[in-house]
Amino acid sequence: MFEQKSLDRIDGDYFNIIIADSQDVTIQSRNTGHYWYLHCAGYPTEEALVIFHKHRFKDWYHQHGHARSLRQAIKSIVKQDDYQLNVRKCI
């Protein structure tokens, strides 16, 4: 379960926060426009997150990976954005 203090740390300047509750977070990167859905499978703590990703709103989500905390998942997303923008240069 996501704690409120973890949810409050999501950077609203970096992400468009679509949904953020105790079990699920849906955000959109303002840098790439990609959508991310984070599901907390750990109860009662956030020790097991599944990260889903899609490139456009109309696309289907695909599983991107796992994380042990919301903070770790956010770091992974920022790293993926950096890769998309600076290595692949496809955006």
Where are these regions (language model features)?
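Negatively charged, low-complexity tracts enriched in Asp/Glu with abundant Ser/Thr
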Residues: 1-33, 56-60
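Mixed-charge, Lys/Arg-enriched low-complexity segments
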Residues: 4-7, 52-91
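Solvent-exposed, non-transmembrane amphipathic alpha-helical segments
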Residues: 27, 35-37, 87-90
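Short aromatic-glycine-(Arg/Gly/Cys) micro-motifs in beta-strand/loop hairpins
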Residues: 31-62
